[in-house]
A protein has these predicted regions:
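Positively charged, solvent-exposed patches that mediate nucleic-acid binding
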Residues: 1-112
Length: 112
């Protein structure tokens, strides 16, 4: 899990990022990102009830994505806010290396 410093603390930042951010979409996960003035990255992972009804399974997906983000965090651009929105329950069972590759590719596309 990422340190609390690198996570969103309130809904205001998430709403601002949704409203003013740019989106990169893949079939399983999309990334909404926006530049911030804090000097470090902030990250949130969103898994809706449409993806998985069970809260236990949604939290498992969220923990896996946070762990993949933590593994690839040094490749993330500085001074940006990131919201990962999960669209597929396949993320719960996909290979962790594949998930890390997906997160890394989203980070690299956000730099361009």
């Amino acid at each position: 899990m990422l340190s609390k410093k690198y996570r969103f603390h309130s809904r205001g930042g998430v709403r601002f990022t949704y409203a003013h951010g740019k989106t990169i979409r893949t079939p399983k996960i999309s990334l909404v990102y926006n530049e911030n003035s804090r000097g470090f990255q902030r990250v949130a992972v969103v898994v809706s009830k449409k993806v998985e009804k069970s809260a236990v399974k949604r939290n498992r997906i969220r923990r896996r994505v946070y762990e993949a983000i933590r593994a690839e965090f040094e490749h993330a651009p500085k001074k940006h806010d990131f919201i990962f929105v999960v669209y597929s329950k396949d993320v719960a069972t996909m290979d962790f290396a594949e998930l890390c590759t997906l997160v890394n590719s989203l980070f690299s596309q956000s730099v361009i």
